[in-house]
Amino acid sequence: MSAFKSYRVSHEYVQTNPATPEQVFPLLCPVREADWLPGWQYRLIYSDSGVAELGCVFTTPNPPASPSGQPLRPNQAASENTWIVTEYDPTTFRIAYVWINPGKIITELRIQLTSAEPGVTRSQICYRCTGLSEEGNRELRGYDRKWFEARLQNWETTINHYLRTGEKMPAASG
């Protein structure tokens, strides 16, 4: 029996979006994310409709750097995350995903949209990440509250720019 003990990180964040839940919900899709998120890359593996739906499967490249921005060791190749939509309810504006970075981390992402006031949406976003190995545990230790908030604030800024202008925000240079 292994002495491995998994490490888990959970974070929640509430975004405010300048649009109705009916306008925001379709953007929470691997295909539509390319419309508003600079640098978003995905490969659609399975979807009957061609967009997000229950059971939709897609992959995304894992960035070749840790959350702290440190480059991976030269012998570490970038990997792919495999995602599946585990909940999809456009009537209640709920969507959930599970994705796995093989041998390292499994992540649950749950999003619930609610109308805050006319033309404004509150997006409750919950992440739960679990290490699958010592390497995954080490990576997760960098997923602190500061890292998470920076990531979600960027998400909020980019989706809100799209909702206000109909255009993708220019990618940051540098």
Task: Indicate where each model-derived feature is located.
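Hydrophobic-cavity lipid-handling domains and compact docking modules
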Residues: 72-88
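Short, surface-exposed coil-to-beta transition loops
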Residues: 10-12, 78-83, 105-110
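Hydrophobic pocket/interface hotspot
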Residues: 23-28, 34, 58, 85, ...
